[in-house]
Regions:
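Short, surface-exposed beta-strand/loop "edge" segments at domain boundaries and coil↔beta transitions
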Residues: 54-56, 79-89, 107-114, 134-142
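Bacterial Sec-dependent N-terminal signal peptides
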Residues: 3, 14-41
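Tryptophan-anchored aromatic micro-motifs
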Residues: 36-59, 149
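Hydrophobic/aromatic beta-strand elements that line small-molecule binding cavities or substrate pockets
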Residues: 61-67, 90-92, 114-121, 146-149
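Edge beta-strand at a domain terminus
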Residues: 30-32, 129-151
Length: 151
């Protein structure tokens, strides 16, 4: 009798296991009309915030993205008041309805000389952050840069 009860319980458990599995994936499929490098291309103007040993300062400036190939974009960082003028290349991809890009090479091969990452939301707002070492007078200082701008 015990064996019969165990068999029935095992069959019921197995049956409930398959009943519990279902298609819960109701996520909409996003169809993009442009590739990531084409959709993200443009000039984004806004404010740079530079933080370092000498405090925090805010400057106006821009970042320009230009398509460089499949999933690649040329990035130009421009902030004359903070002596920032650098060019680099980054990987770029779709992220939900916006874009993300980054370059993790922190060497002189990367024109910025530091790794960086950024995000562009569906409204065209860009956020970028990185830390670099810059010479001010005779000393080298480490500064953290953050950019917030709009296309």
């Amino acid at each position: 009798m015990k064996r019969f009860i165990y068999s029935v319980v095992a069959l019921l458990t197995l049956g409930f296991t398959f009943v519990a599995c279902g298609d819960d994936n109701d996520d909409p499929v996003i169809n993009y009309d442009k590739t990531a490098e084409q959709g993200s291309a443009g000039t984004y103007t806004g404010e740079w915030t530079r933080s370092g040993d000498d405090g925090t300062a805010t400057y106006s400036g821009s970042i320009t993205l230009e398509a460089a190939g499949t999933n690649a974009t040329n990035v130009t960082f421009s902030c004359p008041d903070a002596s920032l003028d650098a060019k680099s290349i980054a990987n770029v991809w779709h992220a939900n309805y916006g874009y993300e890009f980054f370059n993790q090479t922190a060497s002189t091969a990367n024109g910025l000389g530091a790794s960086f990452s950024g995000r562009i939301d569906e409204a065209g707002n860009m956020n970028v952050a990185f830390t670099i070492s810059q010479k001010v007078g005779r000393k080298n200082y480490e500064f953290k840069y953050e950019f917030k701008g709009k296309k």
